[in-house]
Amino acid sequence: MSYTGFVQGSETTLQSTYCDTSAQPTCDYGYGTWNSGTNRGYENYGYGYGYGQDNTTNYGYGMATSHSWEMASSDTNANPSASGSASADSVLSRINQRLDMMPHLETDMIQGGVYGSGGGERYDSYEACDSRAILSERDLYRSSYDYGELDPEMEMAYEGQYDAYRDQFRMRGGDTFGPRAQGWARDARSGRPMASGYGRMWEDPMGARGQCMPGASRLPSLFSQNIIPEYGMFQGMRGGGAFSGGSRFGFGFGNGMKQMRRTWKTWTTADFRTKKKKRKQGGSPDEPDSKATRTDCSDNSDSDNDEGTEGEAAEGTESAEAMEKGSRVDGEDEEGKEDGREEGKEDPEKGALTAQDESSQAKRKLQASKKSQDKQKKRQRDRMVERIQFVCSLCKYRTFYEDEMGSHLDSKFHKEHFKYVGTKLPKQTADFLQEYVTNKTKKTEELRKTVEDLDGLIQQIYRDQDLTQEIAMEHFVKKVEAAHCAACDLFIPMQFGIIQKHLKTMDHNRNRRLMMEQSKKSSLMVARSILNNKLISKKLERYLKGENPFTDNPEEEKEQDEVEAGALDEGAPSEATELTEGVPAQPPVPLEPAPGTTTPPPPPPPEEEESPVPLLGGALQCQIRGIPGLDMEDDEEGGGGP
């Protein structure tokens, strides 16, 4: 009677056809129908090799092509429906031939064919054997079959070249693979049925040799893709079939050992040098270097089979240290030579440095002298500007032209400021300030009459303030005229339409009202700072007594103008303090001479003691950048002012 069963693998589907020659009952374990009679061989099974994917010759052992069992084309193209013992015997004879070749493959694996330079880049060759030679007479296919019930002959199967592996991995199971490996090792020694299979399998890096995969409820098919049962805890390892992940444990499969060997080769000597030095410090001085190196390197390895590799690493470490010592000696010699050269060149370098210092000092002196000259010129220009420029101290208004000053005195802006000051100060004090501004304007007119070429002087002042004259034409930079709105902090092109449009905007009207209130408050602070001056306070006392305080000595008036200019420059609450502190430094007022005696006029004060007075006060200077004749602070910064 003929039955057909199917074995489902991860990649291929194998159709198994056999002929049942006995009348004994059968048990289906999912791998076809297995005979449970006394015949425990594979002689009664006929296997067809009809595959659904391109008739490949790889039968699912998870191996590279070089380690696969290649079948002849006649076998591959056999009729799937054929039955009979002849075809089964021919197939099994070919399988037994492959099995007889396994001892030769084992010898090659021990000599490095798999653990380092095997033909397969990913998996080891499938290690199998004829289970009939080593198993007892018990039922091979019983589901509760386990390692604990093997015959002594089964244990003898391990005697040979793998004894060292078995003992070493049993001792290192917990150290290398963590808690899970310790559990497997304990279960293997304690004789638990299920865990002992796992522990034995992982402690002995032999694949499935001599074991025929016991510990599972079913025997795997010889052509099944999953040679090792699929258990969730093993997913993530790398090998054949169920082990689809990376080679974390580093043994049992050729690729893991190969990668570890490559890792050994890629390690640098610096990894061993530090540990070796620590070992030398902590251990005895008589301990050889190779022993210390091997002890340190064993911590980084996953297998104890790399003695040759450790020897290579030790030799590489010693050679690297020798090279390092040689390089250190050479480096010390080179450093000594360089030190000698530096000592020999020390005096010439000092001389060169001295010359450089002298040249730098000379340049600094030239720059300082140039700055002092520019400062002196600027100071003279500022003094000339003070004499010919009209100034309204409370409104912070300055102009070179007389008609503009008259218009300002009659403007609403000027009157509102004085009205605000009158509300904060006594009426007589406010009237004194009004008379003070009027008298100052008259004195400025008298000084302007003494100047021969007033218009030329004004033009010269404007030219000096033009910083674009020093810029070459290839830079295409020139001076332009623009209107500056201090309330909006905005520069406007000098075009009538644009200016009128800006004046009608809502933002400008809101900002100008706020600016007006701020300007009034600032004018009050300026008025108080002026009145706090001792000379002006004496004039105020005389004015309150009904006398004319503006007919005093011209030199006294000059000092008062300078003090007032300082107050205008600040325009802040600190102005009063600065003015009161600067009063003692001023020369005292000369006494009136007795009648009938003549005294020479007092000498003018030196120019160095006078503080420069810019065209505009500090409060407005930042708001009128670029306006001709008013940008004195910018000129000070460009000319190297204090």
Curated annotation (Swiss-Prot):
InterPro entries to which the protein is assigned, alphabetical: AKAP95, ZF_C2H2_AKAP95
Residues modified as N6-acetyllysine: 258
Chain positions with Phosphothreonine modification: 268, 293
GO BP annotations listed: regulation of mRNA export from nucleus
PTM comment, free text: Phosphorylated on serine or threonine residues possibly by PKA.
Region (Sufficient for activation of CTE-mediated expression) location: 1-269
Subcellular location(s) of the protein: Nucleus; Nucleus matrix; Nucleus speckle; Nucleus, PML body
Residues modified as Omega-N-methylarginine: 209, 218, 238, 248
Short sequence motif Nuclear localization signal: positions: 275-280, 363-365
Single GO molecular function: DNA binding
Phosphoserine: residues carrying this PTM: 284, 298
C2H2 AKAP95-type zinc finger span: 392-414, 485-508
Asymmetric dimethylarginine PTM positions: 209
Region of interest: Disordered: 265-382, 546-642
Skewed-composition ranges (Pro residues): 585-605
Keyword Zinc: yes
Acidic residues bias spans: 299-315, 553-564, 631-642
Chief site of localization: nucleus
Residue stretches of biased makeup (Basic and acidic residues): 288-297, 338-350
Entry similarity comment: Belongs to the AKAP95 family.
Main function: Could play a role in constitutive transport element (CTE)-mediated gene expression by association with DHX9. Increases CTE-dependent nuclear unspliced mRNA export. Proposed to target PRKACA to the nucleus but does not seem to be implicated in the binding of regulatory subunit II of PKA. May be involved in nuclear envelope breakdown and chromatin condensation. May be involved in anchoring nuclear membranes to chromatin in interphase and in releasing membranes from chromating at mitosis. May regulate the initiation phase of DNA replication when associated with TMPO isoform Beta.
Assembly: Interacts (via N-terminus) with DHX9 (via RGG region). Interacts with TMPO isoform Beta, PRPF40A, RNF43, lamin-B. Interacts with HDAC3; increased during mitosis.
Protein name, per record: A-kinase anchor protein 8-like
